[in-house]
């Protein structure tokens, strides 16, 4: 590498899957110089992820691409578990009270188009072979597909490069966990006698399967047969998928004409820390789990939405260590919870004794028939119910998700948040720091009370209007990203403020 020219950037993002694409786009929109590296040379045809949950759609709405993605798939309003038990998504307090079924490749295409509209690009065929950091920045060494060596220098690096993350490996981070299910089969097929338009999941001890419609005549099938365990590299025959599906769901729905067949194994793993100095991990590079519930890609996108504005603040010079550390504090517990919930779905599906399966079906159906429990389950799996921890003494609103609302100026809150802005909801107030825009809800709200919404759509501060000027001057003006008081909450600006 001696004599090799070094390209400089504010942030290097490694991995151009959904997590890296959304993050890179957010950073570029905030005025950050970004290099996005991708080992692949072209689009992947492997798309295990297919479910886009409500909270992810809300994040995409903030970025102006939700409708574009929605047009590529179909929506379902219930997640069917173990026969009759179902999680009702239709009552979610969201503009998107459903689950969008579309291949991950479509999500990547939509986010790639957004990236390019913002002036970004992907450096394809770039394999990371080394990462080294010091007090001032991070150096990333890359081997291009033609064998050429390249070097990048940035203030921060984000590894969003999947389960086999080169960034995580270069850091020497452990990825503790275990394999949960081996020899899982994945198929995209047509069905002669398709099921109802819901995501169906069931297990009978020796077999597990679920089926989801793409909406264009194709169906995604995951299937597993305990009696037929082979290496991941073994080719998949459609007959194997049919047999496992029949065992789990009672029928193979007349599946035929496969356009894609694959075999893989499912792990449950999570790194101890999402941050090591100036290097961060997001998406599957930080956590992986079973596909049950369809939360993997969604969790990665939420990682990116959380991290992007914080890195932009740091690059601008005022987002300090406490703000960057809040990424670990807020997102690591979410990853752990997703591991638990998706793992529970699989373990319940794989109960072997007949009496155990009968008990499972009875208990799960009964529990989901209780409205508060059903509402909680829908909020957890969709991430609409997610709340970030707030500091002691903070206003009860701090850390909560803010639903999209209509504003008096004709926009919605999602419109106002676009571009990584903070939005101060409430009655008109005085001068604001540069990162903050004022907006008044068309309906509701309290006189003399303000709510500061972070760029990712969560409450960062709330309280009496007369308290905001002093708080914001200290917070946005100091350039520290530290909370000045107990009422502040987990918030940080995206550009230096004037106070």
Predicted regions and their residues:
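Core Rossmann-like FAD-binding/catalytic domain of the broad FAD-dependent monooxygenase superfamily
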Residues: 1-358, 364, 368, 488-499
């Amino acid at each position: 590498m001696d004599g090799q020219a070094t390209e400089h950037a504010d942030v290097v993002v490694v991995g151009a899957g959904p997590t890296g694409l959304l993050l890179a786009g957010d950073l570029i929109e905030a005025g950050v110089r970004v290099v996005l590296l991708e080992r692949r040379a072209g689009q992947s045809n492997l798309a295990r992820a297919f479910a886009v949950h409500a909270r992810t759609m809300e994040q995409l709405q903030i970025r102006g691409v939700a409708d574009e993605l929605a047009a590529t798939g179909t929506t379902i309003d219930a997640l069917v578990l173990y026969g009759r038990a179902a999680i009702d998504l239709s009552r979610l307090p969201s503009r998107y009270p459903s689950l969008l079924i579309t291949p991950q490749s479509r999500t990547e295409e939509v986010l790639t188009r957004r990236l390019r509209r913002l002036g970004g690009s992907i450096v394809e065929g770039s394999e990371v072979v080394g990462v080294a950091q010091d007090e001032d920045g991070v150096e990333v060494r890359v081997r291009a597909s033609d064998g050429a060596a390249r070097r990048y220098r940035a203030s921060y690096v984000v590894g969003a490069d999947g389960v086999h993350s080169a960034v995580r490996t270069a850091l020497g981070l452990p990825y503790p966990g275990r394999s949960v299910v081996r020899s899982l089969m994945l198929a995209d097929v047509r069905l002669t006698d398709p099921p109802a338009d819901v995501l169906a999941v069931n297990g009978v001890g020796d077999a597990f399967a679920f089926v989801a419609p793409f909406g264009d005549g194709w169906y995604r099938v995951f299937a597993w047969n305990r009696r037929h365990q082979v290496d991941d590299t073994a080719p998949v025959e459609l007959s194997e998928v049919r047999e496992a599906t029949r065992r789990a769901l009672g029928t193979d729905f007349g599946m035929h004409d496969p356009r894609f067949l694959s075999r893989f194994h499912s792990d449950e793993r999570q790194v101890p820390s999402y941050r090591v100095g100036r290097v961060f991990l997001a998406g599957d590079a930080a956590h992986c789990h079973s596909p049950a519930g369809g939360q993997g890609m969604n969790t990665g996108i939420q990682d990116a939405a959380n991290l992007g504005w914080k890195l932009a603040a740091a690059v601008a010079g005022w987002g300090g260590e406490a703000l960057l550390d809040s990424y670990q504090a807020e997102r690591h517990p979410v990853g752990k919870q997703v591991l638990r919930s998706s793992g529970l779905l699989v373990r319940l599906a794989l109960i072997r004794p007949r009496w155990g399966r009968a008990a499972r079906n009875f208990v799960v159906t009964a529990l989901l028939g209780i409205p508060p429990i059903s509402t909680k389950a829908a909020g957890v799996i969709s991430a609409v119910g997610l709340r970030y921890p707030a500091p002691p003494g903070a206003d009860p609103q701090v850390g909560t998700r803010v639903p999209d609302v209509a504003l008096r100026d004709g926009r919605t809150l999602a419109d106002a948040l676009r571009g990584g802005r903070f939005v101060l909801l409430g009655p008109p107030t005085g001068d604001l720091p540069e990162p903050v825009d004022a907006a008044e809800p068309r309906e509701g709200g309290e006189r003399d009370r303000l709510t500061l919404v972070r760029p990712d759509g969560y409450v960062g501060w709330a309280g009496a209007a007369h308290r905001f000027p002093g708080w914001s001057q200290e917070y946005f003006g100091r350039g520290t990203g530290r909370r000045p008081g107990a009422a502040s909450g987990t918030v940080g600006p995206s550009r230096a403020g004037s106070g």
